[in-house]
A protein has these predicted regions:
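N-terminal alpha/beta PP-like core and its mobile active-site loop of ThDP/TPP-dependent enzymes
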Residues: 3-6, 10-253
């Protein structure tokens, strides 16, 4: 998975991996006749056609958007909405299921498209307390995850760390945020981490956590001991990751 836009015709294991890795993927699957599919969806019957299967219950938990395209008139709307969903926010796979009769019908030249919602997000400003703590910090540390790379912010982060002389550790997902020969690179913590990064985390007095979900493989099974001496500030695009009860942070954005 290259964490870029991808096209796939099957199957679910790859989609699940893309979902967990925040990798955008566009899946198009074939399906039995739309009338047969609609009957299955309405009645919950296990199977009606020879190769028919209602896919939505199977893949809805590993996709950001799923739609059964029941009419060629709606294909543009679903294509545009699926693409937007795959690339907006925390990226991930989307899935369009197209019945055989819809595939064989002619689509009109003029079709309704998907209207992209107005972006209401605003740039969060770090609190004055956090800035003051960072300025007074004697042992600051940055923990960079895949979100730094996915947002295109790796260059800005390294520029900031270089200017402030702040060392960096990375999660496994952020492995390419900073090169290993960079003087500011310390290591990678976690289950398969190195000694230096673990010491840095436990000894730092201020930790800036960027684009990392602080997985169990990164912080271990005793989250209250993670960076126990540090004031921790976390920024992540996925609010669900920030709201985890066991994430040991003092501020989040």
């Amino acid at each position: 998975l290259r964490r870029q836009r991808q096209m796939c015709i099957r199957d679910r294991t790859g989609v699940a991996e893309a979902y967990l890795d925040s990798s955008p993927m566009f899946v198009i699957s074939g399906q039995a006749n739309s009338k047969i599919l609609q009957y299955q969806m309405d009645t919950g019957i296990r199977q009606k056609g020879t190769q028919s299967l209602d896919l939505e219950p199977m893949v809805s938990s590993i996709t950001k958007y799923f739609a059964a395209v029941m009419s060629p008139d709606s294909i543009r709307f679903h294509m545009e909405k699926a693409y937007y969903s795959a690339m907006e926010g925390r990226r991930g796979p989307v899935w369009l299921d197209v019945p055989i009769d819809v595939q064989n019908r002619q689509a009109p030249e003029q079709m309704k498209g998907f209207d992209i919602p107005e972006d209401k997000k605003t740039d969060a400003e770090i609190s004055s307390e956090a800035l003051e703590r960072l300025a007074k910090s004697e042992k600051p540390l940055v923990l960079a995850g895949f979100g730094v790379r996915a947002s295109g912010s790796a260059g800005k982060l390294l520029e900031f760390c270089d200017k402030q002389n702040i060392p960096v550790v990375t999660s496994r997902g952020g492995i390419d945020v900073i090169t290993t020969d960079n003087p500011l690179f310390v290591g990678r913590p976690g289950s398969y981490g190195d000694r230096a990064s673990h010491f840095a985390i436990q000894e730092c007095d201020f930790m800036l956590i960027l684009g990392s979900r602080l997985s169990v493989s990164t912080i271990g099974y005793y989250p209250d001991r993670f960076g126990k001496n540090a004031y921790k500030v976390m920024a992540d695009i996925d609010r669900k990751e920030i709201d985890k009860r066991d994430v040991p942070v003092d501020e989040n954005y």
